[in-house]
Amino acid sequence: MLPTTKAIPKEMLPVGRYPIIHHVVEELIASSLSRLLFVTNRTKLAIENHFDDYSELMMHLELDGSEMTEVSRFDYRKRGVEFFFTRQQVPLGQTKPLGTGDAVAAAESFTDGAPFVVAFGDSIIRSAEPVPLLRRMIDSHLAHASACTIAVYEVPPELTHHYGIVVPVAAQTEAADCQLAGILEKPAPDRAPSRLAVSARYIFGPQIFPAIRAIPPSSSGEIYLTDAILHLIQQGHMVRAVRLSPREQRCDIGNHRAYFQTFIDYALADPQLGPQILDYLRQVLAHHSGNEGQPAP
């Protein structure tokens, strides 16, 4: 995402009216999660600032009723939500953190032996389901006493090398909630055991922490969460996957094309400005269809 993210954390890029991480937090709250730990680093102070107390700002704003209602949603203390922050350390002699497994390990004392949710801050899950994805994952995790539950969705075969790909047990390959026999990190299309890609949402039990400590770093020196999950499976722990439904969408902000598409989706869904944006896009498309190479009106 460079140069866009040279000075702005990717998680703070706006999508519609809010930064990406704000959408993720609202998704967590919608599934009744109220104690949220952000694992960040020194380049991501803007995230902490975004979720800071808004009372001083409110005193200096002159807002009408609708604006006041919108801004008051940022008062997370009144909503019973607590935020905590810790930094993923960069070891001496290294130039970057040690990967997703190391980031999860930084939360061990915070979780205090209880099951917990992991949500990557650069991916949004849009859901039109009455029971959202994370709530279904939590219910499955508790019902099966799992060590790990992963969100997955189907990707085209040619894209498997961009994702972790799961291996359902033979009898459950089409199930919406299935047990896993394995997981591979970014396999080539001809080696992919399925088209079910990991979708940036996990639920773990405390078993994940010794699994992270047990696995060796990759050739790049990183500790991959995928390897720790495979270790859980190999040790006989229950690991499951819950599929996104047809009414759910993963918005993976990993490149500019995906970011532009996601922003357009959210702009069109805006309750106030969506119809105007749709009219504008129709004008732009009509103009381009008849005036190739000319600037839009």
Which residue stretches match the model-derived regions?
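Structural beta-sheet core signal
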Residues: F38, V118, C148-A151, A241
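A short acidic, often aromatic-flanked loop/helix-cap motif at beta-alpha or helix-coil junctions
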Residues: V90-L98, P157-E158, P189-R191, E248-C251
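Terminal amphipathic alpha-helical/low-complexity segments used for targeting or macromolecular assembly
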Residues: V25-S34, T43, D52, A175, ...
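Conserved N-terminal catalytic core of the sugar/cofactor nucleotidyltransferase
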Residues: P14, Y18-F120, I125-E129, D139, ...
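Conserved core of the sugar-phosphate nucleotidyltransferase
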Residues: I124-A211, I215, S219
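Short N-terminal binding/cap micro-motifs at the start of the first secondary-structure element
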Residues: M1-P3, A46
